[in-house]
Amino acid sequence: DKKSAIKKSEAYTTTDGTLHIMISQRKPVVRFVSDKGGWYADETGFIFPLQKKFTSRVPIVDGAIPLDISRDYKGLPKTKYEKAWVEGILDFVQYLNENRKWRDAVAQIHVEGNGHLVIVPRNGREKFEIGRPDEFKKKFAKIEDYYKFIVPEKGADAYTKVNVSFDGQIVCRK
């Protein structure tokens, strides 16, 4: 089935005529939502369509998803760029899942038109511009610095955008 999330299936009969079916499902780790449609990806980067009867509770990445695929696409990303981008997102999601503090703090992961990531925290009005999906440890350390040094001095609602994608700096905008 083109819409299935089945990773592997085996069927066989025994000598007494009993039919045995073994199914292994794909486990989604992230959900992509764009104006082109929605898809899941598993830990290997395999992309498959959303299911009508079930929604997995996984991080949602929305916005300008840079994948040129149809709504019912099932397979690995088509180009080197798409593969690298999906791998970056999977690394990002894995980083969030391994760091409970950040997993609980991030409400939304949004993709800008240039493919860069913006995260929206559950608390506060600022949006954090992450840039490319790489160097997460450094970027989240800058977010910690923002809360540790800038918020106490300027106030919690002083900025709406905080860019942590630049090397060695935090750029705040009202």
What are the roles of these predicted feature ranges?
Residues 8-174:
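Charged, solvent-exposed interaction patches on well-folded alpha/beta domains
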Residues 1-5:
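Amphipathic, non-transmembrane alpha-helical segments in extracytoplasmic/periplasmic proteins
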